[in-house]
């Protein structure tokens, strides 16, 4: 196996046979323990002629959370806009069908479900302010 990751459980044994080991640990204390703790890997890999390379991961948990929330918000804006366009088009289609006496079998049901959901959402929003 050319590359291994420091891990637990079933993955640990195959990783011990890897040519390269990658660690991605949450803190400096964890890294120190993994490399030079009581059962650290540093002594064994040094005997094999291993070298250490550092490539720290930028950012932190807080920054990653903010980035993920921002990406989610951006995608939700697109979803909300698509819903607004869809309900407008559904209303136009329903009006056209009514004026030409052409039934849209599930169109009116979809429109009614949207109206029902909108009123429930409005009610919950008003309750939230109190």
Swiss-Prot record:
N6-acetyllysine PTM sites in chain numbering: 43, 47
Pathway the protein takes part in: Amino-acid degradation; L-valine degradation
InterPro entries: 6-PGluconate_DH-like_C_sf (IPR008927), 6PGD_dom2 (IPR013328), NAD(P)-bd_dom_sf (IPR036291)
Keywords tagged on the record: Acetylation, Branched-chain amino acid catabolism, Mitochondrion, NAD, Oxidoreductase
GO terms, biological process: valine catabolic process
Residue numbers binding NAD(+): 1-17, 25-26, 30
Major localisation: mitochondrion
Gene3D superfamilies the UniProt entry points to: N-(1-d-carboxylethyl)-l-norvaline Dehydrogenase, domain 2
UniProt-listed Enzyme Commission number(s): 1.1.1.31
One term under GO cellular component: mitochondrion
PANTHER family on file: 3-HYDROXYISOBUTYRATE DEHYDROGENASE, MITOCHONDRIAL, 3-HYDROXYISOBUTYRATE DEHYDROGENASE-RELATED
Sequence similarity: Belongs to the HIBADH-related family. 3-hydroxyisobutyrate dehydrogenase subfamily.
Subunit and partners: Homodimer.
Protein's recorded name: 3-hydroxyisobutyrate dehydrogenase, mitochondrial
Organism for this UniProt entry: Mesocricetus auratus (Golden hamster)
Species classification: Eukaryota, Metazoa, Chordata, Craniata, Vertebrata
Gene name of the record: HIBADH
